[in-house]
């Protein structure tokens, strides 16, 4: 076997890149340290210098995976150059698309099997999950502007997140035949979420046509 000349400083990144490429097409359970060694032309002992075990590797994948997930969601939610309703719509739709495009990684991040590893890194209970913090902050922004009902922002964010997780799971696990209509289902779900969250004192202002068709008695 021809061994590649990897620098010590980038070998860990190479292992992670191979791991992410692998789980894009296959389940994390099928990833072995031997696969990493073969792909990089290194020995398994080289892997153990960076990861003490497969669980340690998976824990790092979870940590990096959540960072990637957050980069896909938070900038949209926190972009105050866009109106709040559009931010909600685009970010939450982005959540669905990210799950659909990364089903194995999504299951790894949010599934039950590796929950102990995940919970050793972050939790929505202590604000260490950055994407959830951004969602809750956007809910609070909406409350302060009078758009969203002034209720428990944590519970409101949980309702949004749970709805997104439910639809995402149905899509990626083919539990229901929704592949052809998931965008329509998402729009219907978004309208239902808005109906429960939006203050009755405002009319929604949005660049999204179907949102503007939700009538409220007063122009914001």
Give short role names for the model-derived ranges.
Residues 60, 74-105, 160, 209-210:
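Hydrophobic alpha-helical connector segments
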Residues 23, 58-65, 109, 117:
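Alpha-helical DNA-contacting segments of helix-turn-helix folds
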Residues 121, 143-191, 200-220:
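Hydrophobic/aromatic-rich alpha-helical bundle segments in the mid-to-C-terminal region
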Residues 11-20, 36, 61-65, 69, ...:
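Generic hydrophobic, amphipathic alpha-helix propensity
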Residues 104-137, 176-179:
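Short secondary-structure transition hinges
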Residues 14, 25-56, 60:
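Helix-turn-helix
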Residues 3, 63-88, 120, 125-131, ...:
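Amphipathic alpha-helical linker/stalk segments
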């Amino acid at each position: 076997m021809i061994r590649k000349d990897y620098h010590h400083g980038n070998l860990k990144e190479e292992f992670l890149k191979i791991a992410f490429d692998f789980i894009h097409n296959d389940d994390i359970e099928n990833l072995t340290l031997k696969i990493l060694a073969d792909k990089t032309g290194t020995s398994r002992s080289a892997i153990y210098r960076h990861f003490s075990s497969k669980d340690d590797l998976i824990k790092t994948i979870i940590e990096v995976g959540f960072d990637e997930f957050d980069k896909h969601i938070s900038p949209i939610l926190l972009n105050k150059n866009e109106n709040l309703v559009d931010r909600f719509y685009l970010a939450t739709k982005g959540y669905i698309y990210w799950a659909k495009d990364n089903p194995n990684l999504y299951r790894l991040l949010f599934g039950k099997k590796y929950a102990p590893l995940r919970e050793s890194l972050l939790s929505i209970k202590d604000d260490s999950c950055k994407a959830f913090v951004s969602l809750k902050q956007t809910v609070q922004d909406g409350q302060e502007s009078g758009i969203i009902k002034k209720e428990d922002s944590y519970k409101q964010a949980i309702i949004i997140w749970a709805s997104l997780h439910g639809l995402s799971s149905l899509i990626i696990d083919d539990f229901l035949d929704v592949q052809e209509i998931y965008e329509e289902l998402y729009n219907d779900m978004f309208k239902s979420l808005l109906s429960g969250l939006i203050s009755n004192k405002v009319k929604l202002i949005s660049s999204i046509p179907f949102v503007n068709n939700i009538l409220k008695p007063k122009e914001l």
